[in-house]
Amino acid sequence: MQHYYKVSEMENRLAGEAYAQTNGAWVEGERLIFGKLSIPEGTSSKPHSHPNEQISLVLGGRVRVNVEGDGRVLEKDDINYRPANAVHSAEVIGDEDFAFITAKDTSWGIQGNVATPEEAARKGGKDAVQHYYRISEMEDRKAGESYAQTHGTWVEGERIIFGKLSIPAGTKAEAHSHPNEQMVIVLSGSFHMNIDGDERTLVADDIAHIPPNAVHSGEVVGDEDYVFVTAKDTSWGIQGTPVKS
């Protein structure tokens, strides 16, 4: 199984070509689809939906998003949660492409379905879930405290756990595993990772795919914190279980 990917070496593909010019690269695992995508400036993503849940983090640019009538302008480090089958759309604002990291569960593919006019007009009810999060306003929590100093913020959906985390310079993540699948993309810093004996030093825009129950560990390389976006399926939580050597 391939554990490591470089976005720069992956095929740039269209995602949602029936309703948007969204393009980028992604990895399809057993339970998660995870990738780095962008929507060109001056374009929009028409109302659409898909049976799978989706969570995204803005990397750059500004976008006006609407989820079931709940609208918000999103900028860097904002998170957008789209429940399964929620009708949503987006319009890129300004003269910069909208770049984002996204995760979906594999109950459906990367492509959505164009909404009918009736579906596009649908509004969420009073019990609608929270669709938008700003990392600067979220609690910084520990993740994996029994084996690493990993910390950050994350959103837990019905099927996906998704967040932005970091591991301090000069520290390690000791060997651990978890029953859920995990995907990681590096934002900054460098990290030497070992997944079931397969080792690689990761830098910005590298993706790691950690299968369920795979034993993995790592060490931050250099004097910069290792910052990454990660997704896990919800068959287990954010915390893993240490593995004794």
Predicted features along the sequence, with ranges:
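Ligand-binding loop in jelly-roll beta-barrel domains
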Residues: 84-109, 212-238
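Glycine- and acidic-residue-biased ligand/ion/polar-headgroup-sensing regions
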Residues: 52-63, 180-182, 186-191, 196
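Conserved GNAT-family N-acetyltransferase fold
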Residues: 37, 56, 80, 165, ...
